[in-house]
A protein has these predicted regions:
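Acidic, His- and aromatic-enriched active-site or binding-groove loops in soluble protein domains
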Residues: 62-70, 176-198, 281
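Short internal beta-strands
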Residues: 159-163, 339-342
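Positively charged, Gly/Ser-enriched RNA/tRNA-binding surfaces
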Residues: 17-35, 46-47, 70, 81-94, ...
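Auxiliary tRNA-acceptor-end handling modules of aminoacyl-tRNA synthetases
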Residues: 1-18
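Glycine-rich, mobile lid/loop segments that gate access to catalytic sites or pores
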Residues: 162-170
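Polyanion/phosphate-binding surface patch
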Residues: 9, 40, 44-74, 117
């Protein structure tokens, strides 16, 4: 029956998958906390207009929206940044700056599915508000490098491509593109590496760009060297100065080997204003692992006073595909330390007492609740990833002991229950 299948594009998480998810999230949290970030959360359900104000047409078309029982238009969050902006705006002036927060929310987008992309995913978000210098952007890059190192990835496997929305602004200014046309052009440019050149050119022309403008955009945004960018934009380019400062600071962090300038990185969302970046597998086999950048003028789109801000979103699906490709998925056993089993049904009450005493001491114990054969119990204990099997037998218990089998070595010993 179709109603017994999960909704297309969503995932069930069985215990082994939850262990892997917990492992991944623990490294998300550790990388952020090592850099002084605090965790926050927000509702999954928001007013639809929160996302249709300034996010860009593509994300608006991907919203899961509906009308609630009171006739309000609401949406499942497609990303976390608008919710974060709402939270910051609601306490404007009361929050000490800079704000360094992170979250791991579930996000929803109705989009085409492919490897590393579903219609729901968990997204690690790390943001800094109230710091306008490029130092904050480099701090975010350092958080990413800390995470990659923790999960066993190296600069040979992952690269951080960076540019600035100011590069795009200067290029488009030079060919006379401004206003609403700017946001539409950004979306096409964000797809340059994914679309055939002829199709991208056709989309530019649909937006009213002439051949000369298209050639200028494609040439400048195809650059991979900051010196070449300086030649194209001029030595007085604000964008070039900003990116050179970013590169210098990255050297101070010791993360420059992860970084590479890529003029085509613009990010598709309309609210970015400065440095932007994406993490990619060097193999080129996967879509972007994560992406982010500076969004200094977001709050004014909600009617508030702008506050400098920068951040990134990092989905859980692509990184797991990359870790599989690199052989870095860990083998994770369950959390059970001991399995307790009464060999005689009359000893079940005593087994409950032993298990309760161990749990009170903080040990993870699985108590076999039904009458089972010892062979089944051994298989069960190994399946749980338990360290020991605690057996209650009449003879040993009369002498004040239980039998304990070390499941790694197979060695058995007798131990007093209160010494477990």
């Amino acid at each position: 029956m179709s109603d017994l299948q999960s909704v297309r594009g969503t995932r069930d998480f069985y215990p082994d998958e939850m262990r892997l998810r917990g492992w991944l999230f623990s490294h998300f949290r550790a990388a952020a906390q090592l850099h002084g970030f605090e965790e926050y959360d927000a509702p999954m359900l928001e007013h639809e207009t929160l996302y249709t104000r300034k996010a860009g047409e593509e994300i608006t078309n991907q919203l899961y929206t509906f009308e609630d029982k009171s006739g309000r238009r609401v949406a499942l969050r497609p990303e976390m940044t608008p919710s974060l902006a709402r939270m910051v705006l609601s306490r404007a002036g009361a929050l000490p700056l800079p704000i360094k927060w992170f979250s791991i929310p579930q996000c929803w987008r109705y989009e085409r599915m492919q490897r590393g992309r579903g219609r729901e995913h968990y997204q690690w978000n790390v943001d800094i508000w109230g710091s306008e210098g490029v130092e904050a952007d480099v701090e975010l890059l350092a958080v990413l490098c800390t995470f990659f190192g923790r999960v066993g990835l190296t600069p040979a496997e992952v690269g951080l491509r960076f540019s600035s929305r100011k590069v795009l602004q200067e290029v488009l200014d030079s060919v006379g593109i401004t206003g609403e046309q700017f946001a539409a052009v950004c979306i096409v440019i964000d797809k340059l590496g994914k679309l055939p050149l002829a199709e991208a050119t056709a989309q530019f022309e649909e937006l009213g760009l002439g051949t000369e403008a298209v050639v200028t955009i494609q040439h400048t945004l195809g650059l991979h060297d900051l010196d070449a960018l300086a030649e194209a934009l001029g030595d007085d380019s604000i964008a070039v100065a900003e990116l050179r400062a970013l590169r210098t600071l990255a050297e101070g962090y010791g993360i420059s080997e992860w970084l590479e300038f890529d003029g085509s990185i613009v990010r598709g969302l309309a609210y970015y204003t400065g440095p932007v970046f994406e993490a990619h597998a060097r193999s080129g086999q996967l879509r972007a692992i994560c992406g982010g950048g500076r969004y200094d003028r977001l709050l004014s789109s909600f009617g508030g006073k702008d506050l400098p801000a920068t951040g990134f979103g990092f989905g859980d699906m692509v990184i797991l595909e990359l870790l599989k490709d690199c052989g870095q998925i860990p083998e994770l056993d369950g959390s059970v330390q001991d399995v307790v089993f009464a060999l005689n049904p009359e000893l079940r009450s005593a087994a409950m007492e032993v298990a309760s005493r161990q749990r009170a001491q903080g040990q993870s114990v699985d108590l076999v609740l039904e009458e089972k054969r010892l062979k089944w119990v051994l298989k069960h204990a190994n399946r749980c990833g338990a360290e020991r099997l605690v057996l209650l037998a009449p003879e040993e218990l009369e002498r004040g002991f239980v039998k304990v089998r070390d499941l790694a070595t197979g060695v058995e010993s007798e131990i007093a229950p209160d010494a477990l």
